[in-house]
Amino acid sequence: MITAVANETSELKASYNLGYVWLISIVAAMGGLLFGWDWVVIGGAKPFFQRYFELTSEAQIGWANSCALIGCLIGALVAGALSDKFGRKRLLIVAALLFAMTSIGNALASNFAIFIAWRIFGGVAIGLASNLSPMYIAEVAPAHIRGKLVAINQLTIVIGILLAQYINWFLVRNLPAGATDEFIRNSWFGQQGWRWMFGLTAVPSFLFFLGMMLVPESPRWLAKNGKSERARGILARIGGEQYARAAVADIESTLASEEVQHVRFSDLLEPRMRKVLVLGVILAVFQQWCGINVIFNYAEEIFRAAGYDISTVLRNIAWTGSVNLAFTFVALGVVDRGGRRPLMFLGSAGLAAIYILMGFCYHGGVKGLPMLLLVLAAIGCYAMSLAPVAWVVISEIFPNRIRGAAMAVAVSSLWIACFILTYTFPILSAKFGPAGTFWLYAAICVLGFLFIKMNLPETKGKSLEQIERELVD
């Protein structure tokens, strides 16, 4: 059996083809770009398709905004079993095709029912990509840069969000001020503009499809499925023959004590696996329940409560996107140097402190610039910590044999938590006010800090097999 020490030695001696590793990681991270793009494009399109389809009830509008979450949950649930059977690469190719098909389908939708159906199918693509892109990158990346490479997926999500926001703005930049509902419904903006917002998603979707056709299959999936020679060839291209031999031996050693077979979800509840599964699920849920996505999803309401008018709200939203991108770059530079635990501590403690201050500002009637700065601070804190690092950790803590199924459970939990967070914010805000709601999120962040301190080991610089031994054996 190859020991952890031997594995670390092979990591240090390997001469890596970093250009190749970065290339295949960036291609896989295109799934994150499409995830971010598809997630926010509906926000810019809503004022126009709402009038085109003559949606008048809050229930219809809410259904249009949230129906994709059903598909997200479905995609996340099936991703594990299907990727374990058919491979990570093939399922990412399917996700790329789904992104392309659904973007065109939404662009051509002739009625609201068809529009909703395509949105749900688009959610399936998001669920697949959100599960498989970070998993694939984690399985091809050398240990010493795995955190940085997996964090690229978060960077591309942020880039996708920004691209969608700017394309939405560009397409409607000439909309006359004070345009009436009737004018919008009968104008190019109401008839065709929103269709272009969805349809343009097909361009990066086809690029993602072409890129995934050219990258290799995950070597860890190949080794798990009895194709060690193919796995060795891919790993040799990444780090040379010595690295490949040691890596394949290490992968096989972690599988040797267990029969490699179809993984059932009941297998995840085995005593050896249960602890690591609970760890991954709680981290995924905490990434959502830390509250930051409320700021993205309800930015208009939050900024209006802070005293801003609609024109200034749009400017502030652009600032949030820019800060999100800038601090995601910061995360890329520190995730493999600073470690996972310190960044998770920074995110949970930093957000708790910021939310407490936001609560006092709301409670005391403080408006304007102080609130904007606190919101930007919260987004920056999240973007360099919990946003990328949670994805890194849940992509690397699960054992080889159950990684697909366990990732499916964790990512499904994340989407359920996202739905609960998004659904409950208006209810909580109405009952407790903005101040009480953000104080509640601060309390959740404190609990998250304590959970991380007691349960999350440092995974920086360790191979996936070393992490498995520490958490499971």
Role assignments for model-derived ranges:
Residues 2-230, 236, 257-473:
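Alpha-helical transmembrane bundle of multi-pass membrane proteins
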Residues 241-246, 469-473:
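Short arginine-rich
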Residues 244-256:
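Short, well-structured alpha-helical segments
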Residues 235-239, 251-252:
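Extended, hydrophobic alpha-helical segments
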